[in-house]
Design a protein with these regions (language model features):
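Structural signal for interior beta-strand "rungs" in well-ordered beta-sheet cores
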Residues: 94-198
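Hydrophobic, well-ordered beta-alpha structural blocks that scaffold small-molecule cofactor pockets
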Residues: 1-43, 56-59
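Short amphipathic alpha-helical segments
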Residues: 19-21, 78-81, 126, 198
Length: 198
């Protein structure tokens, strides 16, 4: 059976990591990359297909896309591109590394990527357009809302709620059952204990 083709929207460093996961998952063929940088012609052997303005034309030939721009300070660009891709009719699949563990009792949203060696336990809900990065741990019953980035080695303990648009830095950890604010930024290496009014 022929694998469907997938367009990657965004051609930076995060895109390289996404390419490796997509190749390992082996469910999609990468058609190429869409990026505003006209100075690149390819990335890891995949061609540049155009920029954001070409997506409507590309939709005539391709059904699937993934947002492959990273997220640190703000999710705004990822959200804008997601909304645009959806408005054109692209399907945005969840991509899960075969080296990750995702419980059969967890739920993963559309357009989310689960990177190598991530661990997602039972009862977890991960929303749409999220990055669950390499070696991160999402413990039982935690909720990661839409458009979040859980960075490399971060630990989200049981029952925690990471509100939409938030970023949890590398090797940061949360206490159990806490709740962040929307678009929160938890610094790398820190322990987030929640807010005083919880």
């Amino acid at each position: 059976m022929t694998k469907p083709s997938l367009i990657l929207i965004g051609g930076g460093g995060h895109c390289k990591s996404c390419i490796d996961v997509i190749e390992q998952e082996n469910k999609f063929l990468i058609a190429g990359i869409v990026d505003i940088n006209r100075f690149i012609s390819e990335l890891l052997g995949y061609p540049l297909l155009g920029n954001d303005d070409d997506l409507a034309k590309l939709k005539l030939n391709y059904d699937y896309a993934l947002i492959t721009i990273g997220q640190i300070k703000t999710p705004a660009i990822r959200i804008r591109l997601l909304d645009y891709a959806k408005s054109l009719g692209f399907k945005l699949p969840a991509i899960i590394s075969p080296r990750a563990y995702v419980s059969k009792h967890a739920k993963i949203g559309n357009g989310t990527i689960i990177m190598h060696d991530a661990l997602i336990n039972a009862g977890v809900i991960v929303g749409d357009n999220c990055i669950i990065n390499t070696k991160s741990l999402i413990e039982h019953d935690a909720v990661i809302e839409n458009n979040c980035h859980i960075s490399t080695g971060a630990i989200i303990n049981g029952g925690a709620i990471i509100k939409q648009g938030s970023f949890v830095g590398s090797n940061a950890a949360t206490k159990e059952s806490i709740k962040t604010n929307e678009k929160d930024l938890i610094k790398a290496g820190s322990l987030f204990k929640g807010y005083a009014n919880e």
